[in-house]
């Protein structure tokens, strides 16, 4: 959607070019003896610099938003799918529309012909419509998240989110394709003129479908979010929220920073503690409400940026006396474009998760690739393993500071101690185990397998052997030997063959935090 910036332009050269000095033209087929380039005044140079920086920032910022979700599994939620869709729409606008809008603004005329002008205007409407419809979907998603915080994972699934996003783009295409099918005013005689479609009925149709109807849905949803949030917060803090009577089994997946926990909450049984259930509800609700606040800021900025344009466009198309001056229309038009670079600023300022994701990406530390690189670099370095107490699985417990020393020291003549770990009920029985030490092996080579000795005090089981055993490579299993002074005095069942330890485990180990 671009304004008709120069409707009176009928010459073959731009009116804003400076005078050609020292130009001695001797004939139509002869060149000047001392030709010079058009002068570029300071104001126009500043405009080029500002518009170029604005477009570059919009492109880089929206790419960061997309990569943040793609490189962080805990950010791959249905809500963030809508955010990614919004970023894709803004990125498409920044790539395919803003450069040509800036060219039109700087040169003062269109240089790519009539057909491409129509395509460019349609893509403009498509991207802007997809942006606000994505915000409309986000507002509905936030209402469901706040109103039904516990049932949200089952109500809003990945499949439903993808279907909603497809619907957004289909509806946006329907609204934007009208001018390409002939629903527009007659084209001007000069192909160097290019602007928005000001056919009155299409201007009204596109304004309603692209802005006003989605805006009404957004306002209604966020009003309901505010009412529900206020009432639910009051009830939860007072501790009078009733337990759900119809739920038989509920699975909660709680994501807090980098901490992931799966818990199972069974039916109302004897000994059920209402306070713990209320605490879980309060945690879930607080998280959903915080997300609603962040996205509310995004919606508010979108309305502030695009509302002036969608007021000026239909009024100017329906009533010629109300058409704003060209200078005013340019301002409100570029104000709408300015919204494309605001969202990448809002997300890291309002969400610590997005801020950390941005910092990792800017530091070239996309999570998946970073783990693989650290695995290769560390080789046989000692890592901390902590058995996880939920569901009988093992989980990493190494802190970020301890995961990798700045010196990159590995097990070469040094001794590293693993902190005490809470054993998994499914494997280690009850009780807390003392610290387990990994002894230094001077001949330990990179790539050697790393494991833990059998935890002391483990209850015997008839159906399984030892959890961790070591054996010589290429030889049958044999009982281990007691540690001696050469290995730091640790009690292990380890022997070395050709500088590498053998390893056998009857239980899978979760890798450390790479």
Swiss-Prot record:
One of its GO terms (cellular component) is nuclear membrane. It comes from Mus musculus. One of its GO terms (biological process) is behavioral response to cocaine. The gene is Adra1b. GO terms for molecular function: alpha1-adrenergic receptor activity; protein heterodimerization activity. This is Alpha-1B adrenergic receptor. Keywords: Cell membrane, Cytoplasm, Disulfide bond, G-protein coupled receptor, Glycoprotein, Lipoprotein, Membrane, Nucleus, Palmitate, Phosphoprotein, Receptor, Transducer, Transmembrane, Transmembrane helix. It is found in: Nucleus membrane; Cell membrane; Cytoplasm; Membrane, Caveola. The chain crosses the membrane at residues 46-69, 83-104, 115-140, 161-183, 201-223, 295-318, 326-350. It comes from the Eukaryota. InterPro entries: ADR_fam, ADRA1B_rcpt, GPCR_Rhodpsn, GPCR_Rhodpsn_7TM. Homo- and heterooligomer. Heterooligomerizes with ADRA1B homooligomers in cardiac myocytes. Interacts with CAVIN4. It is a multi-pass membrane protein. Residues 70-82, 141-160, 224-294, 351-514 are cytoplasmic. The modification Phosphothreonine is found at residue 263. This alpha-adrenergic receptor mediates its action by association with G proteins that activate a phosphatidylinositol-calcium second messenger system. Its effect is mediated by G(q) and G(11) proteins. Nuclear ADRA1A-ADRA1B heterooligomers regulate phenylephrine (PE)-stimulated ERK signaling in cardiac myocytes. PANTHER family: ADRENERGIC RECEPTOR-RELATED G-PROTEIN COUPLED RECEPTOR, ALPHA-1B ADRENERGIC RECEPTOR. Disulfide bonds join 117-194.
């Amino acid at each position: 959607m671009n304004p008709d910036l120069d409707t009176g332009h009928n010459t073959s050269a731009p009116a804003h070019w400076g005078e050609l000095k020292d130009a001695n033209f001797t004939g139509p087929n002869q060149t000047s003896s001392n030709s010079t380039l058009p002068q570029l005044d300071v104001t126009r140079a500043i405009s080029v610099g500002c518009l170029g920086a604005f477009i570059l920032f919009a492109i880089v910022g929206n790419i960061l938003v997309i990569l943040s979700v793609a490189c962080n599994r805990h950010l791959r939620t249905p809500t963030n799918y809508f955010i990614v869709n919004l970023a894709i729409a803004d990125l498409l606008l920044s790539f395919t529309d803003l450069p040509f809008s800036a060219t039109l603004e700087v040169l003062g005329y269109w240089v790519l012909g009539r057909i491409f002008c129509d395509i460019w205007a349609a893509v403009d409407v498509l991207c802007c419509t997809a942006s606000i419809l994505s915000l409309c979907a986000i507002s509905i998603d936030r209402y469901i998240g706040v109103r039904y915080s516990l049932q949200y994972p089952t109500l809003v699934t990945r499949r439903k989110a993808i279907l909603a996003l497809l619907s957004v783009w289909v509806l946006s295409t329907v609204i934007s394709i009208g001018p390409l099918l002939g629903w527009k005013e007659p084209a001007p005689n000069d192909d160097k003129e290019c602007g928005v479609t000001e056919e009155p009925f299409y201007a009204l149709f596109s304004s309603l479908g692209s802005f006003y109807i989605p805006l009404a849905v957004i306002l209604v949803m966020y009003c309901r979010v505010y009412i529900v949030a206020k009432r639910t917060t009051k009830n939860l803090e007072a501790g009078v929220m009733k337990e759900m009577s119809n739920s038989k089994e509920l699975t909660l997946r709680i994501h807090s920073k980098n901490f992931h926990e799966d818990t199972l909450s069974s039916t109302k049984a004897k000994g059920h503690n209402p306070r713990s259930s209320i605490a879980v509800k309060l945690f879930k609700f607080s998280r959903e409400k915080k997300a609603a606040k962040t996205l509310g800021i995004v919606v508010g900025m979108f309305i502030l940026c695009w509302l002036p344009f969608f007021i000026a466009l239909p009024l100017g198309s329906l009533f010629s006396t109300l058409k704003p001056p060209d200078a005013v229309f340019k301002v409100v038009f570029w104000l709408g474009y300015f919204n494309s670079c605001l969202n990448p600023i809002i997300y890291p300022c309002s969400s610590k998760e997005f801020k950390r994701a941005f910092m990792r990406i800017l530091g070239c530390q996309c999570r998946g690739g970073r783990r693989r690189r650290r695995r290769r670099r560390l080789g046989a370095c000692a890592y901390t393993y902590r058995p996880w107490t939920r569901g009988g699985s093992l989980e990493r417990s190494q802190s970020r500071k301890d995961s990798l020393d700045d010196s990159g020291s590995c097990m070469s003549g040094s001794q590293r101690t693993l902190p005490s770990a809470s054993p998994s009920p499914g494997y280690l029985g009850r009780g807390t185990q003392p610290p387990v030490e990994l002894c230094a092996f001077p001949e330990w080579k990179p790539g050697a397998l790393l494991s833990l000795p059998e935890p002391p005090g483990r209850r015997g089981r008839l159906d399984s052997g030892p959890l961790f055993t070591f054996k010589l490579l290429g030889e049958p299993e044999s009982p281990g030997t007691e540690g001696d002074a050469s290995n730091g005095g640790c009690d292990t069942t380890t022997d070395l063959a050709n500088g590498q330890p053998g390893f056998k485990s009857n239980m899978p180990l979760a890798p450390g935090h790479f």
